[in-house]
Curated annotation (Swiss-Prot):
InterPro entries noted in UniProt: Leucine_aapep/pepB, Macro_dom-like, Peptidase_M17_C, Peptidase_M17_leu_NH2_pept, Peptidase_M17_N
Keywords: Aminopeptidase, Cytoplasm, Hydrolase, Manganese, Metal-binding, Protease
Catalytic residues, chain numbering: 280, 354
Protein name: Probable cytosol aminopeptidase
Amino acid sequence: MDHTVKSKTADTVSSPCAVVGVFERRRLSPAAKAVDEASGGAITAALKRGDIEAKPGQTRLLTDLDNVKAARVLLVGLGVERDLDERTYRKAVTAAAQAAQDCGAGEATFYLPEVEVKTRDLAWRVQQLAIGVTGALYRFDDMKSEAETPRKPLKKLALGVADKAEAKVADEALAQGMAVGRGMSLARDLGNLPGNVCTPSYLADQAKALGKRFDKLKVQSLDRKDMKKLGMGALLAVAQGSQEEPRLIAMEWNGGKKDEQPYVLVGKGITFDTGGISLKPGAAMDEMKFDMCGAASVFGTLQAVAEMNLPINVVGVVPASDNMPDGKATRPGDIIQTLSGQTVEVLNTDAEGRLVLCDALTWSERFKPKEIVDIATLTGACIIALGHHRSAVLGNHPPLVKALQDAGETSGDKCWELPLDPEYDEQLKSNFADMANIGGRPAGTITAASFLARFTKRYQWAHLDIAGTAWLTGEQKGATGRPVPLLTRYLMDRAGA
């Protein structure tokens, strides 16, 4: 989607559709007031008639208003003015985007960021507009023979700024928000693809394609032979039941100084998870194509970082594999040696994510990271603990955990810290190996992170469990693109952007 900034008032802007906010109790935003005065009170009249009550997310389309250059004016309800908060603002943006597309304008000029949102500045409001519009209009029709396209899709987003002094800030924020939105779309695309298309090799090809787009992005991909030579026994143990070749993918964004330590993101890339010999129930197993959403978020974040040209060094690492039952598959009770040299008794082959991650986390030490964050759809226990609204965050470095929490609050892609006390680590004891790969039913999210913590003692590390936030079920079934907003905001903060 193209985007631009227009330094025009809502009544003078030449646009197929101008989008303005209205509040309950017939209060108008500055843009709505300008249109109302120019048109002889058309908006006030609509409010008096009850055409729109201005409750959050309500919309009403007005056309051919006198003395207004825009062909259409879309009114968007913002609720009570003094109560306008982040959640209400995002709801209004989503509704506005959908209504702007449905009206067939093809292009819309949004004035919503001019309104005051509690504790948030103009840049935040513009970024959230761009992210919200991109997300609201996202469609995944790639696998359909006949795509259900709108009669006239919204192809251009314009941001209306009445105050020219704010145009520069708005322009930069709009570009940043669009980059995050496109990163989320990439993550959603990868997540929504079926397992017979989005294989480990497919992900490696997508990484190479990203590398060709951006000069500062270096890409490498290790195959089974490379992993065997290195001694990645855990990743290979997961992969050995599948005919699909595993891959370990690294994408290095060199936007900072050559000697600056990079921030490393490690994303779980199980492209389809049957559970292996510890086979999952058949119901809803199709959703296990989403088990690579951690990897997808790394792709989306790296693309956003590259589009924004952030002055920071970032490495994205993706251990990619299927987890399949086969005559060669790992059995419950097998003992494997990880890249770190530690041994693991595999009591449950459906706890495979931590196995591919532990080798990737050890391998990532070669980058001499400043901080490492791993992202994984790791445990169903996380859904029980936090539902589908917040991801879980755990780690060995409180300032890093706090930075991720802050990034989540700012972006709206929120996370919640769970403890990582040493007592939980005792649940991983094995009589036959250094550790077991499961710790029983109690505190499943925490014991999974405790397992990973054994491989991250040499650097500052945090773990994001996105099992409850990476995809939706039901009528809106599909990947969400989370936690791309959180990760991108975290890296922007680290880069001072």
